Amino acid sequence: DVGYTVKGVLTLLHGYTNSGDDWMQMTAAPRYAADNGLVLVMPDCGNSFYQNMMHGGAYKTFVTEELPMLLGRMFKLPARREQNFIAGLSMGGYGALFLGLSRPDLYAGCASFSGAVDLSMMLADPAAPGVREVFGPVFGDGLLLPKSSDLRVLAQRVAALPAAQQPKVLLTNGLQDVEPYFILQQNDAMHKFLKPLGLAGYRRLQWNGVHEWNFWDRSLVYAIDYFLNNGYAAKKLNDW
């Protein structure tokens, strides 16, 4: 019993080397959820980029199939697409768009906060420091991004669906979020690709900020507002 009427489920995905607990410790996510009748699901998925890893766990299957089935049985959580949303930060930002666009039948909205949304940019130089260590277990020794994991390919497929079947898509990034992950550049490139597609519900927000929790806390408020279309962000402005 969460103490309020449950209106929906919001799955929050963590960043690289982080865990689901960070959302509880570093943001006001529980308060935002209570304000809006949302149940939070915050899985731990290692450094998987939310893939069915080449050398590791099947995390896409875990988040989109196994975990919802388990939680539905245990807690009778809402299963309707219209009541399910997914968001994440950094690696989890990519993950939220990857899962949301891969399974538009499951999620009514997906949001990336400071997301590593252009993995082709990150994989461009396999000899760069850390690339093989980070992505080898995920995509294999060839370090090739499969079409099934490419957000551009997935977005094109979603854009071809009827508007009512497309999830809302939100990108947020800080204007100073540059090195070492080039998040601004990745989001600029993805925005340039997504905007002309004519997705039924696409939005990008950016403001002064870097790769840190204050930015992601604020992004979470904007995402809830966008998903539920209830003016929640305007109500929180006085708190910022």
What is each stretch, according to the model?
Residues 1-240:
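Non-catalytic cap/lid and distal C-terminal segments of serine-dependent acyl enzymes
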